[in-house]
């Protein structure tokens, strides 16, 4: 299994809206990709901005490429997500999942 890790930041006042967008629109839409296994959304708030870490789980790098394209290290954004984000990591990082106890 492959874990795709990416980070983005919102202004503090946009954090709840972005979280709602992730949970109700973006992530449910990924369920249609065969080999997509789910995601974790992590959030850390401070006074000025909120950091989001999104970890998507896929069966293989081939499935990641179906989602992200051949240059799969580039971050993928829906136009609506850009309305919330004030800064982003341009690249996603991929890890091989070696153990899971969840």
What are these regions (language model features)?
Residues 24-27, 32-33, 57-93:
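An amphipathic, aromatic/His-enriched active-site/gating alpha helix that lines ligand/cofactor pockets
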Residues 15-17, 63-65, 101-102:
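Intrinsically disordered, low-complexity acidic/polar segments
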Residues 12, 60, 96-99:
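Non-catalytic surface loops within mature trypsin-like serine protease
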Residues 9-22:
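Short, surface-exposed ligand-recognition loops at beta-strand->loop->(often short) alpha-helix junctions
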């Amino acid at each position: 299994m492959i874990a795709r890790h990416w980070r983005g930041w919102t202004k503090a006042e946009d954090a709840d809206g972005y979280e709602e967008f992730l949970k109700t629109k973006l992530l449910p839409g990924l369920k249609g990709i065969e080999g997509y296994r789910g995601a974790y959304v992590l959030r850390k708030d401070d006074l000025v901005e909120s950091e989001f870490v999104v970890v998507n789980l896929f069966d293989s790098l081939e499935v990641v490429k179906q989602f992200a394209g051949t240059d799969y290290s580039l971050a993928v954004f829906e136009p609506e997500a850009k309305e919330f984000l004030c800064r982003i990591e341009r690249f996603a990082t991929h890890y091989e999942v070696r153990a899971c106890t969840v």
